[in-house]
């Protein structure tokens, strides 16, 4: 085995780190890097005075060697017994694996190691490493420990620039395939700036990028009590002053820093109050002793006689430190295991024998029990609930864990977990408001709801830890990690330029190549941008930084105040807009996806909308999704976000034509270094020089052609109002709430102006109608928890033109309601029956109203909210009393008025239908005549006279002798007087004698008949 002298600077760096309690970072380039881990660990073991440092070994899938420790130990013991162990010849790596406490961990299971501490961390499979994983693992290493990153053999570190990372496959979409590895480039360049970082090859030769260690010198040995800081002296004084106050004194004695001691005192103050209504929130960066402070506080709660103590965290594995300090507290309080308490460990192999229960039976039965964050229902008898790593628990679960008991919570706020800001921004903000409300006296506005709110109000105490315990202050690796991942941008700079008018501000395009080049000026600008991101958004993880730098479809814009021409410094940033270009998916891909139910990564809006509406054409449109609009916290709500959005829309509508003749071409691929050009040991890595300007005006860059702008966000009333005001229309609302925030994802779209604008807007109007119909149906299911105000805000949208719907007809009415139903409604409208009698009809009425099928029926906002709450969300009047904030009597009055209006409308519909069925009366159209009345009468008289003459002429030609009535008046008078009143027949003597010829008989009979008839007529006249 060839032996080689190790560079002395490596040993000095490790020993200095141990002496200063600061971590060191080693990047080992080469396939045999794992063999050098043994040497580095050996140096660390010699430098530290305590036991062999434990190791955390993280990998993707394949470890590359057997991790079976027992098997290796048996083999080793056999060799020792047989005397065949040769330390010079045997593989030192085998010995290292057998004799060291190594925790092997897949990258996708690193959440289980939160809260644990290791002496050394090894990260292999660099391509699987993400910023989140880097932050999570590096922060578990204690002061004096080592972080070792293993890279494969390469000729140049610049090969890492073009290395394909596993996460890149998620950034590629059908339309955007070319990923540029800006994050890796910045990562490598940042290594040169870290004073405690060494980049070495697998022969332990130091590479030129780490030239800063050329002058490293060993630190002189220091006495332990030398140079105590003022904080350490204050801590000693505090411990001495509390010696006589027990059990507080012994617990504070276990604290390492002044911050931690003050936190423990605050916890014990909450315990001793025993109001069970206060929340103590402890926030700090990693490695500040949060879990230890909680553990000591739990020991204090047991000493104060608390019986039911529950502890929760994402996994029992995260509670190693907490329980370790519970037992340290017990030792200080002179509790003895088995005599005073017993420990129950988990048998679940996933939890790695974690402590899940402690039974204390010194004075009376007391328990400390681990529960899963989702099991808040089991907290019925709790007196104290402790939430560790609250930042890693979804926000809705943390809210459900708060109740009528004392709550201690600890949270990491550096944003490494992704939800750290969520907890500090949202939850603690809400607790602050509740706490403030409890101080205010009740008003007479609505005493019932105010009293209920005050009953649940809690007092909030906030504690933060600044001083690090896991490693000494000023740790170089912590500073490097914070700068690399922009974790430490919580302190946002105040803008000194005043409030410019939003109309005067301009939007600029940010060149990402320049932004992530690790130049000093661009680093300052990047930190400013990320500070805005962190301060104005609920969820911000380091992975977002990698997506921003590497994803090909993402673009950055920033809103800047008017910049005077003489200004040399970088301007203040008012707002940042991140846009992701989506769409342009081939129809075939969408059809395949719809038929198989599979979606590719990326293209969030096209895939979701295509699936929701089963529309294969939508994915072909090109759109821009606004990923974030982050506005400076001092300027929120002043119109800067709306201005940025307005300018962005104008840019993509082509209203800023590109005036540049030669557009700045950014090289798509990075120049690779040939292996002959320079060796790894001679290569000098520096930031690139030939970079385009950081900021471009919108008319200096041609815009991509887009059909629509879209946004997907967690639905809140404020955000909905903002996007509606910007002209966006909701088309999708996810039915299940987001695990992290408890909010429902909402997708809203807006078409961009084009020549055929009417046709453009038609598909959006169709989507909106379909969405509204579905949303109304789902209001009684997943969306029943929404407040009526929020639901109304979603349904009412003026950004889509109202289409004229057919009025409600009698057939439709009869299909929905029986005559008896209408009778019931009428009876209620007259206050003759109770409202329970018509509750079954309200859903149908609500649906008709909100689908605009009730014609001109108009309701006030309160009436609409009431109708929606009762009819579509199926809420009780008591619930609505709290949500609408009106007394129930007033609500019932409003409800009766709604039904009256509806009954009147239904009656009108029926009356109209009956009118249409009745016989139609002919309408006489009165028009002025052409002739005067006298002319008209003269003409009619002439016509009559002519007609009369013709008829008289006809009569003259006919023989009328047979119709002549014989006799004169005297004869008739005589005959009639003789006959009397009741006579039916009278006879008059004729002058002619009757002819007796047989031939004339028929004629005679006819004549007689006629005569008889004539006589009858005469008789009738007489009667009259």
Swiss-Prot record:
Annotated N-acetyltransferase domain residues: 558-753
Sites of Phosphothreonine modification: 716
Region (Required for localization to the nucleolus and midbody): 702-1024
Protein name: RNA cytidine acetyltransferase
GO-annotated cellular components: midbody; nucleolus; small-subunit processome; telomerase holoenzyme complex
Catalytic activity, reaction form: a cytidine in 18S rRNA + acetyl-CoA + ATP + H2O = an N(4)-acetylcytidine in 18S rRNA + ADP + phosphate + CoA + H(+); a cytidine in tRNA + acetyl-CoA + ATP + H2O = an N(4)-acetylcytidine in tRNA + ADP + phosphate + CoA + H(+); a cytidine in mRNA + acetyl-CoA + ATP + H2O = an N(4)-acetylcytidine in mRNA + ADP + phosphate + CoA + H(+)
Compartmental location: Nucleus, Nucleolus
Keyword Amino-acid biosynthesis: no
SS bonds (residue pairs): none
Matching PANTHER family: N-ACETYLTRANSFERASE 10, RNA CYTIDINE ACETYLTRANSFERASE
Modified residues (N6-acetyllysine): 426
């Amino acid at each position: 085995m060839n032996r080689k002298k190790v560079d002395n600077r490596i040993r000095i760096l490790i020993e200095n780190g141990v002496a200063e309690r600061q971590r060191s970072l080693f990047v080992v380039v080469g396939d045999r890097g794992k063999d050098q881990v043994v040497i580095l660990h050996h140096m660390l073991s010699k430098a530290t005075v305590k036991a062999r440092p434990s190791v955390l070994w993280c990998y993707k899938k394949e470890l590359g060697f057997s991790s079976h420790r027992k098997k290796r130990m048996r083999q080793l013991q056999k060799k020792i017994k047989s005397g065949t162990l040769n330390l010079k010849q045997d593989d030192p790596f085998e010995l290292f694996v057998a004799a060291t406490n190594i925790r092997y961990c897949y990258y996708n299971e690193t959440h289980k190691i939160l809260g644990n501490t290791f002496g050394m961390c090894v990260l292999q499979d660099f391509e699987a490493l993400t910023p989140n994983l880097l932050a999570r693992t590096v922060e578990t290493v204690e002061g004096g420990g080592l972080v070792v990153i293993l890279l494969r053999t390469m000729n140049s570190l610049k090969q890492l620039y073009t290395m394909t990372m596993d996460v890149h496959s998620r950034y590629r979409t059908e339309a955007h395939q070319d990923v540029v590895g800006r994050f890796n480039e910045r990562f490598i360049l940042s290594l040169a700036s870290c004073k405690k970082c060494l980049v070495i090859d697998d022969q332990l030769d130091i590479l030129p990028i780490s030239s800063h260690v050329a002058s490293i010198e060993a630190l002189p040995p220091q006495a332990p009590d030398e140079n105590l800081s003022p904080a350490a002296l204050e801590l000693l004084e505090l411990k001495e002053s509390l010696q006589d106050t027990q059990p507080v004194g012994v617990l504070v004695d276990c604290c390492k820093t002044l911050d931690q001691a003050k936190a423990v005192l605050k916890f014990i103050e909450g315990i001793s109050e025993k109001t069970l209504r206060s929340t103590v929130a402890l926030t700090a960066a990693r490695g500040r002793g949060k879990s230890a402070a909680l553990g000591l506080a739990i020991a204090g709660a047991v000493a104060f006689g608390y019986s039911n103590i529950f502890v929760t965290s994402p996994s029992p594995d995260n509670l190693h430190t907490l329980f370790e300090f519970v037992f340290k507290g017990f030792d200080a309080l002179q509790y003895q295991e088995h005599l005073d308490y017993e420990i129950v460990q988990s048998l679940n192999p996933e939890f790695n024998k974690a402590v899940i229960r402690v039974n204390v039976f010194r004075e009376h039965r007391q328990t400390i029990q681990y529960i899963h964050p989702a099991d808040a229902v089991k907290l019925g008898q709790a007196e104290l609930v402790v939430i560790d790593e609250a930042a890693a628990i979804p926000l809705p679960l943390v809210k459900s864990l708060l109740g009528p008991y004392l709550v201690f919570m600890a949270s990491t706020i550096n944003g490494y977990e992704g939800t750290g800001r969520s907890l500090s921004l949202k939850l603690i903000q809400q607790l602050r408001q509740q706490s403030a409300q409890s101080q205010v006296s009740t008003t007479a506005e609505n005493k019932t709801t105010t009293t209920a709110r005050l009953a649940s109000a809690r007092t909030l105490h906030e504690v933060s830890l600044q001083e690090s315990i896991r490693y000494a202050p000023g740790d170089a690796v912590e500073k490097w990690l914070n700068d690399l991942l922009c974790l430490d941008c919580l302190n946002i700079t105040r803008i000194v330029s005043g409030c410019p008018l939003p109309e005067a501000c301009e939007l600029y395009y940010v060149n990402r190549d320049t932004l992530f080049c690790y130049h000093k000026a661009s680093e300052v600008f990047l930190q400013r941008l990320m500070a805005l991101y962190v301060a104005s958004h609920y969820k911000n993880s380091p992975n977002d930084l990698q997506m921003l730098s590497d994803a090909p479809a993402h673009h950055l814009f920033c809103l800047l105040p008017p910049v005077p021409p003489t200004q040399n410094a970088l301007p203040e940033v008012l707002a940042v807009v991140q846009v992701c270009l989506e769409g342009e998916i081939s129809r075939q891909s969408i059809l395949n996806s719809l038929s198989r139910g599979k979606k590719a990564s990326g293209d969030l809006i096209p895939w979701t909308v295509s699936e929701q509406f089963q529309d294969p054409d939508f994915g072909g449109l090109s759109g821009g999704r606004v990923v974030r609009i982050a506005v400076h916290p001092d300027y929120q709500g002043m119109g800067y976000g709306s201005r940025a959005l307005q300018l962005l829309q104008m840019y993509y509508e082509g209203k800023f034509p590109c005036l540049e003749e030669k557009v700045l071409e950014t090289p798509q691929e990075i120049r690779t270094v040939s292996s002959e050009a320079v060796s790894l040991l001679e290569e000098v890595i520096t930031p690139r020089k030939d970079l385009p300007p950081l900021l471009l005006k919108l008319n200096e860059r041609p815009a991509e052609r887009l059909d629509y702008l879209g946004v997907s966000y967690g639905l809140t009333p404020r955000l909905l109002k903002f996007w509606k005001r910007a002209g966006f229309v909701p088309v999708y609302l996810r039915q299940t709430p987001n695990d992290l925030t408890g909010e429902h994802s909402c997708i809203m779209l807006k078409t961009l102006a084009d020549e055929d604008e009417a046709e453009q807007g038609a598909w959006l109007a169709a989507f909106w109608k379909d969405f509204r119909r579905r949303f109304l149906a789902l209001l009684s299911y997943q969306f029943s928890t929404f407040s009526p105000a929020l639901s109304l805000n979603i349904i009412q949208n003026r950004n889509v033109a109202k289409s004229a719907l057919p009025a409600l007809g009698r057939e439709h009415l009869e299909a929905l309601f029986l005559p008896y139903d209408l009778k019931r409604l009428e009876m209620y409208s007259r206050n003759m029956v109770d409202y329970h009698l018509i509750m079954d009809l309200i859903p149908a009425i609500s649906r008709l109203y909100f689908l605009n099928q009730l014609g001109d029926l108009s309701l006030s906002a309160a009436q609409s909210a009431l109708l929606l709450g009762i009819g579509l969300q199926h809420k009780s009047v008591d619930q609505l009393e709290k949500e609408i904030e009106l007394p129930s009597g007033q609500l019932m009055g409003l409800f009766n008025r709604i039904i009256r209006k509806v009954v009147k409308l239904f009656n009108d519909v029926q009356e109209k239908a009956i009118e249409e069925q009745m016989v139609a009366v002919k309408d006489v159209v009165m028009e002025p005549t052409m002739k005067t009345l006298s002319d008209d009468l003269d003409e009619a008289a002439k016509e009559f006279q002519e007609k009369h003459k013709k008829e008289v002429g006809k009569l003259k030609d006919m023989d009328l002798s047979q119709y002549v009535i014989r006799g004169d008046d005297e004869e008739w008078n005589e005959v009639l007087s003789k006959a009397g009143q009741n006579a039916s027949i009278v006879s008059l003597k004729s002058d002619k004698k009757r002819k007796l010829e047989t031939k004339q008989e028929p004629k005679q009979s006819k004549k007689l008949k006629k005569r008889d008839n004539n006589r009858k007529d005469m008789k009738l006249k007489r009667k009259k």
